[in-house]
């Protein structure tokens, strides 16, 4: 059983048959060893008690009721004076019934069975280690081919090499007909092999260090070769180099973790604890059971049949043995990952059985729903909405959520500042929502980060830290630039908020997890904070004004008709385009509804006049009575004096472009000010302007 205080991490990997046996075996006082499930039965139809050596056996998995054996005898749990700890009649241990949640059993397979996860999943570990095509290994596993060679390194009778197709069997007629079943099994293991046993023997003969050396030599040879110019051949060489790198990494992993490759072929099949695959009695004659129980039953039936064929029968045809081995392999495949090798296993109502992979993986699987999706203290959840006015490292936290998450902090400060005499009075003030409560809460939020997480957390940017800001409503406000890291959008997505309590967690949030410190992708280094969706739409609206030039606007009759159809509130659309001395006047005119975002206007240009090179010929020249004149170009206008000196320069733009320019300018100034302050000594700061 996993103790949360002593076990801080969980690792899923390969285990040896000895370890599986250790998990399951128990030695009774009479010396009998229990743990192996040999019968495909669950409960007796008359007594409703678990069958002995069945899938719910109390001797193997523990008592159904704490301290009560199958005979009905009772012992005090944990009392060392009580003797014996096992019932002498039924062999059930007097322990807590919760042992049935973690006590495992095992099935001793009559023939080695391939673990389908390591064969069919990508990348296939067995294909990588053996360096053979996947279809060839599948034909061996499912007994479509024989692997003919001296596996045991002894003289052979047939002198065959390579793969032999099952249907042809050219060796069949050379075998004397007086071979019995047991003799045939010995002969086959000596001369040739098929099924999971052939894969297991090849994996057992591997030397991982030799694999690393040979793969490294081949990779260096391919690296030294020059490109052939043939795209197909060059890609083939590149794929081979990638395969060799994966093979070396996998071999190093097996060496580093002390895992033997032959463990990927099962000799002992673990049986889950019964509480994890329950069976319920609805009525007297109706049962509801887990699909895993039905698959276990088929495995035991087929395994017992194969055992009988190999041990008891004398003249069983070898085709029948091969067929039964294939059925056993398919049953174990259905338990691990139903449907991965073709047609899934179904029940009598044509419903697909739910395998272990279906229980573990997916959004509703054991990991994501039960473990990662488990509710914890000091956490909340709500829908996210866009917060365009927020800083990149801030998020909007609803008052209702904030006061619940930080209630303990608010109570502490109320008592510390002598605003409440005890916890009860402080909670009363919080329930009444007094103004002092919100002031204290805002002080706490100014210096306490929170963690935002969006499931599924597939990479480290799926959970980031923010400084919260109190907002109205019930939705969490999020800056749109951080959505890409969360893979979130604002169409109803929900996010969870967590409060880091310890100083270590708060320090980690500030130093490593703040959103403005995770601007680049940790995998490829590309910017992860890029404008998407709403921001791109907003930028398009700001810059989609009529910028085609003065000629098109002035002399196109269709454009004049469009002007006449616009809103009457914008008086400049029917007359000439307005002139503004600075951006503030243009913004004021927009707020007074005198212009809109896309209305063309003339804005006085106050920057270096040398940036405008008068290389083009003016479209029009307007002369004033005082002697000044206007040179009108496509996108700008120059006002000159009588002496042809430049008095003013106006650029033709829109209010949307002005707003975008101001935002960019403020961002650059803020960045420059932050860089200067970071380089100056402590206590000296650069003020804006």
Swiss-Prot record:
Catalysed reactions listed for this entry: RNA(n) + a ribonucleoside 5'-triphosphate = RNA(n+1) + diphosphate
Localization per record: Plastid, Chloroplast
Keyword match Transmembrane helix: no
GO molecular function: DNA binding; DNA-directed RNA polymerase activity; magnesium ion binding; zinc ion binding
Gene3D superfamilies assigned to the protein according to its UniProt record, in alphabetical order: 1.10.40.90, 2.40.40.20, RNA polymerase II, clamp domain, RNA polymerase Rpb1, domain 3
This protein's UniProt keywords: Chloroplast, DNA-directed RNA polymerase, Magnesium, Metal-binding, Nucleotidyltransferase, Plastid, Transcription, Transferase, Zinc
Enzyme class name: transferase
InterPro entries on file: DNA-dir_RpoC_beta_prime, RNA_pol_asu, RNA_pol_N, RNA_pol_Rpb1_1, RNA_pol_Rpb1_3_sf, RNA_pol_Rpb1_clamp_domain, RNApol_RpoC1
Binding positions (Mg(2+)): 489, 491, 493
Record flagged with keyword Kinase: no
Stretch forming the signal peptide: none
Gene Ontology CC annotations of this record: chloroplast; DNA-directed RNA polymerase complex; mitochondrion
One Pfam family from the record: RNA_pol_Rpb1_1
List of residues binding Zn(2+): 69, 71, 87, 90
Domain of life assignment: Eukaryota
Cofactor note: Binds 1 Mg(2+) ion per subunit. Binds 1 Zn(2+) ion per subunit.
One annotated GO biological process: DNA-templated transcription
Role played: DNA-dependent RNA polymerase catalyzes the transcription of DNA into RNA using the four ribonucleoside triphosphates as substrates.
Subunit structure, interactors included: In plastids the minimal PEP RNA polymerase catalytic core is composed of four subunits: alpha, beta, beta', and beta''. When a (nuclear-encoded) sigma factor is associated with the core the holoenzyme is formed, which can initiate transcription.
Protein name per UniProt: DNA-directed RNA polymerase subunit beta'
Species name: Lactuca sativa
């Amino acid at each position: 059983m996993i103790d949360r205080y002593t076990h801080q991490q969980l690792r899923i990997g390969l285990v040896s048959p000895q370890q599986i046996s250790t998990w399951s075996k128990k030695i009774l006082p009479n010396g009998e060893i229990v743990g192996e499930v040999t019968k495909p039965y669950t409960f007796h139809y008359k007594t409703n008690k678990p069958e002995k050596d069945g899938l719910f056996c109390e001797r193997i998995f523990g008592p159904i009721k704490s301290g009560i054996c199958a005979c009905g005898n009772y012992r005090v749990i944990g009392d060392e004076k009580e003797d014996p700890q096992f019932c002498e009649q039924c062999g059930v241990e007097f322990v807590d019934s919760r042992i049935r949640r973690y006590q495992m059993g095992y099935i001793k397979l009559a023939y080695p069975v391939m673990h389908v996860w390591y064969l069919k999943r990508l990348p296939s570990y067995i294909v990588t280690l053996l360096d053979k095509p996947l279809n060839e290994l599948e034909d061996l596993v499912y007994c479509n081919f024989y692997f003919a060679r001296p596996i045991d390194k002894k003289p052979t009778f047939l002198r065959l090499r390579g793969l032999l197709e099952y249907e042809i069997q050219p060796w069949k007629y050379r075998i004397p007909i007086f071979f019995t079943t047991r003799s045939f099994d010995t002969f086959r293991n000596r001369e040739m092999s098929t099924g999971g046993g052939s894969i297991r023997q090849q994996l057992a003969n591997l030397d991982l260090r030799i694999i690393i050396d040979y793969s490294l030599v081949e990779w260096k040879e391919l690296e030294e070769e020059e490109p052939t110019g043939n795209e197909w051949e060059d890609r083939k060489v590149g794929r081979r180099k990638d395969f060799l790198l994966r093979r070396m990494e996998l071999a190093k992993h097996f060496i580093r973790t002390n895992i033997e490759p032959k463990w990927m072929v099962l000799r002992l099949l673990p049986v889950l604890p019964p509480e994890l695959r329950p069976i319920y009695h609805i009525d007297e004659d109706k049962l509801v059971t887990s699909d895993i129980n039905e698959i276990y039953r088929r495995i035991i039936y087929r395994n017992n049949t194969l055992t009988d064929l190999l041990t008891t029968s004398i003249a069983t045809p070898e085709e029948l043995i091969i067929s039964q081995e294939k059925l056993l392999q398919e049953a174990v495949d259905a338990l691990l990952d139903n449907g991965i090798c073709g047609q899934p296993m179904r029940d009598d109502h044509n419903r697909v059985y739910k395998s272990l992979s279906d229980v573990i993986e997916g959004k509703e699987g054991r990991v994501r729903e039960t473990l990662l999706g488990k509710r914890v203290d000091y956490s909340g959840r709500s829908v996210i909405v866009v917060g365009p006015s927020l800083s990149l490292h801030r998020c909007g936290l609803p008052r209702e959520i904030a006061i619940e998450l930080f209630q303990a902090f608010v109570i502490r400060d109320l008592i510390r500042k002598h605003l409440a005499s005890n916890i009860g009075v402080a909670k009363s003030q919080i329930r009444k929502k007094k103004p002092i409560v919100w002031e204290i809460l805002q002080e706490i939020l100014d210096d306490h980060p929170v963690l935002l997480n969006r499931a599924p957390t597939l990479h480290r940017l799926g959970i980031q830290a923010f400084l919260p800001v109190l907002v109205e409503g019930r939705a969490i406000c999020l800056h749109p630039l951080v959505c890409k890291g969360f893979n979130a959008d604002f169409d109803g997505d929900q996010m969870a908020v967590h409060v880091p309590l310890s100083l270590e967690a708060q320090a980690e949030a500030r130093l490593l997890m703040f959103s403005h410190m995770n601007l680049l992708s940790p995998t490829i280094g590309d910017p992860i904070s890029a404008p998407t969706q709403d921001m791109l739409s907003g930028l398009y609206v700001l810059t989609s004004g009529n910028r085609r030039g003065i000629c098109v606007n002035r002399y196109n009759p269709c454009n004049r008709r469009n002007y006449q159809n616009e809103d009457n509130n914008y008086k400049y659309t029917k007359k000439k385009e307005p002139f503004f001395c600075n951006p503030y006047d243009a913004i004021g005119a927009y707020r007074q509804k005198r212009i809109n975002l896309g209305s063309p206007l003339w804005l006085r240009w106050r920057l270096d006049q040398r940036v405008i090179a008068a290389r083009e010929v003016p479209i029009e020249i307007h002369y004033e009575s005082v002697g000044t004149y206007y040179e009108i170009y496509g996108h700008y206008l120059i006002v000159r004096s009588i002496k042809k000196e430049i008095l003013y320069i106006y650029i033709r733009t829109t209010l949307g472009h002005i707003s975008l320019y101001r935002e960019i300018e403020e961002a650059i100034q803020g960045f420059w000010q932050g860089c200067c302050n970071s380089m100056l000594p402590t206590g000296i700061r650069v003020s804006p302007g």
